[in-house]
Amino acid sequence: MAVCYKARRFEVFKANVEFIETLNAQNHKFWLGVNQFADITNDEFRTTNTNKGLKSNSMRVLSTGFKYENLSFDALPTTMDWRAKGAVTPIKDQGQCADGKCKAGSNSAATITGFEDVPINNKGSLMKAVANQPVSIAVYRGDMTFQFYSGEVMTGSCGTDLDHGIAATGYGKTSDGTSYWLMKNSWGTTWGENGYLRMEKDIADKKGMCGLAMEPSYPTK
């Protein structure tokens, strides 16, 4: 039984490495790499390592409006990285979670008792919020490019069936002019850019890449 299991895992590993090498040979702005998910199928990946059910309704505060609404874009910094300001906790590994049992991945910096929502599908409002504090983000992370992401700015299309929580901890622009959101994940430092992900910021879809603009919120307490 153990031999069969190892043989099966090796076949999965080889198929995943082939996918990684094929994509990396194409003209993308980002690249993939072998990581802790290399010996599981994408179907297996989609049923684990998710923290669906990020916020309970009881944790939401009554909406009194978006508190950053009246900020001028001219007053916003052109780049932001909350890590440099000491406002981001170290990367953690949530382990293999399923069925909505992991809920702390995007808001682990402190004990949080309430949230306010950022206006949905509104990149400008999201930028105002992230310029002032880290923001909880829900995304779809079932795509294989998300599974094996290793560096640079992730571009392209992906789904919007939100199933995972990450935190927007900044934004910026690469030397070639590609704008991005800086995201903190909860899969350890062996995934992505030492546990972080950069996602393309200026795209046509108002929902944002992988639905990142659909359910943003920030802690109030």
Which residues make up each language-model segment?
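Catalytic-core signature of thiol
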Residues: 1-221
